[in-house]
A protein has these predicted regions:
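Central antiparallel beta-sheet cores of small beta-barrel/beta-sandwich binding domains
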Residues: 1-70, 75, 110-113
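Edge beta-strand at a domain terminus
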Residues: 55-56, 82-113
Length: 113
């Protein structure tokens, strides 16, 4: 499955992501999330052929948490179903010597008019 995400902040900075969920026996991890980041000029933030990969650390019928560990830095991205029409996505980052980061993105299904 593929998807995209755009985050525009009040200070004018923004981020665009293309995401791919991989759930096949041939994948590096049985269930993983690959992300390619772009800036507002649509330039890749990772190296040309690189992407960020996170593996599933927790998986239930209503929640999945992906994790990446790299030289002391830990990044976790989670998605949790909060009701029939609500989803909470979140991002956590911990790096030695830096303040921890936690950002939440609540989503509610839009109703057709």
């Amino acid at each position: 499955m593929i998807g995209s995400f755009r985050w525009q902040r009040a200070n004018g900075r923004w981020l665009l992501e293309f995401m791919q969920l991989i759930d096949t026996p041939a994948a590096t991890s049985p269930f993983s999330l690959r992300i390619k980041h772009f800036n507002q000029d649509f330039r890749g933030m990772e190296e040309k052929d690189a992407s960020t990969s996170l593996v599933a650390a927790e998986r239930t019928p209503t929640r999945v948490v992906f994790e990446m560990k790299d030289a002391g830095r830990v990044v976790r991205v989670g998605y949790e179903k909060k009701g029939p029409d609500a989803l909470l996505a979140w991002f956590d980052e911990q790096e030695p010597g830096k303040p921890a980061v936690h950002i939440e993105f609540p989503y509610t299904r839009a109703t057709a008019r």
